[in-house]
């Protein structure tokens, strides 16, 4: 559809189906990846042209998919020399903006495709980026793709271990541990049969300094699952509250709400659902912290 009718038509169709089909809700982020890949090919790998047609719907997957195509077109022989310039346009337009973030994160997805899902080789590609902020966002794309690729029939991930659920986070350098743990909970939750209480328990045992981000990651998963389940409004807030309240450690519950709020904004590209969740919290300190996170993340996305 992108080639024949354009990016906007493809998104209009996707948004229409999103309201009707549970499969589309569950797979929406990956579907927007496909639109982004096609758009990048249509615009000859030009990042500004591709981004000008973009849409943040379903977690900005369009931009991540676009970068997968851009990296693939550059190729392994040239990518390390050119990587630092790939995100130059969004960086110069507004450093650390949402477009800049999506570009750097998308590069991580692209490196995984280019290097056959080799996590550590892809992280070495992220290492060539001169900005620490870009390296962090790039690594997040690597770890996200690694978890997604568990179900890749043609090239499943080699860097996931059921008996070591937080691998490879345990083995990557400190700079990349937080981006890893916040995404690895998706895999851990799946392996635990969506038992949120069990994953809270496992997060409580990870290495010192990274338990809070593990709880945030689980909050992301709670919000994502609520969307996939088709819950909305008060039912969605109730589902998220119920799951996050399973945390037993002092910091577990509020950090779970932080992750859920950020993911709701990420998924819907607005703060309606996030604020509804915050307002539903009965503890005043949690409610205030929740609303503050919502405001800060919305401001971050508007940069």
Predicted features, each with a name:
Residues 1-303:
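Non-catalytic tandem-repeat scaffold regions and their flanking low-complexity/translocation tails
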